[in-house]
Swiss-Prot record:
It comes from Xenopus tropicalis. It is a multi-pass membrane protein. Belongs to the SPTSS family. SPTSSB subfamily. This is Serine palmitoyltransferase small subunit B. Its main location: endoplasmic reticulum. The gene is sptssb. Residues 1-11, 58-80 are cytoplasmic. Keywords: Endoplasmic reticulum, Lipid metabolism, Membrane, Sphingolipid metabolism, Transmembrane, Transmembrane helix.
Length: 80
């Protein structure tokens, strides 16, 4: 790909970001606060998803395997 094409594409993405968030009407210091808050929220959502979703999926699998007659992990280990 051409470097100019990549630069144009990134500037187009940034323009779309400004239009979607309506942050083009903010002053520069307001934009920096808005961008900082947005990045902080996105980082917290990603971190929370990384930490808590696997735990909840494991608990849900254990719960539903118990309901539908699945064997517990310790029982399977003893039978092997």
């Amino acid at each position: 790909m051409d470097v100019k094409h990549i630069k144009d594409y990134l500037s187009w993405l940034y323009y779309q970001y400004l239009l979607i968030t309506c942050s083009y009407v903010l002053e520069p210091w307001e934009q920096s606060i808005f961008n900082t808050l947005l990045l902080t929220i996105i980082a917290m959502v990603i971190y929370s998803s990384y930490i808590f979703i696997p735990i909840h999926v494991r608990l849900a699998v254990e719960f539903f395997s118990g309901i539908f007659g699945g064997q517990h992990e310790s029982t399977v280990a003893l039978m092997s």
